[in-house]
Swiss-Prot record:
One of its GO terms (cellular component) is cytoplasm. This is 17.7 kDa class I heat shock protein. InterPro entries: A-crystallin/Hsp20_dom (IPR002068), CS_dom (IPR007052), HSP20-like_chaperone (IPR008978), Small_HSP (IPR031107). It comes from the Eukaryota. It is found in: Cytoplasm. GO terms for molecular function: unfolded protein binding. May form oligomeric structures. Gene3D superfamilies: 2.60.40.790. The lineage of its organism: Eukaryota, Viridiplantae, Streptophyta, Embryophyta, Tracheophyta. PROSITE patterns: SHSP.
Amino acid sequence: MSLIRRGNAFDPFSLDLWDPVDGFPFGSGGSSSSSGSLFPRANSDAAAFAGARIDWKETPEVHVFKADVPGLKKEEVKVEVDDGNILQISGERSREQEEKSDKWHRVERSSGKFLRRFRLPENTKPEQIKASMENGVLTVTVPKEEPKKPDVKSIQISG
């Protein structure tokens, strides 16, 4: 059993899902068994979906999401808001067209999809979300609403 993930740690499309019982004899979904499993090994497409690494930080003014998407063009990445408060970041890298005359010696770059969803806090302005991409890093900025100041009402004391 290994705690180290298989695949290239710098490629969000190539990571396998870690199986905590991989290698045990009682039917893990890992390489040691192909039968039913408590934790079935994901196929490469499912692993690609889970593999996208995204950081989320909050500042006093905004929420910032940063995703490593090396090799993707901005046309291959989607940023959407679903139901007003679910931020969805997805992308797809297609396979390179192969010519019959091509002879491949090594294929390390993978193709696949990823999809990540985040529930935005109530104090955000989803209609003002901005996204940019530079050097293989997608940055999504979600502005926050200014905190509401409590209404203070003076009560006149009688008597």
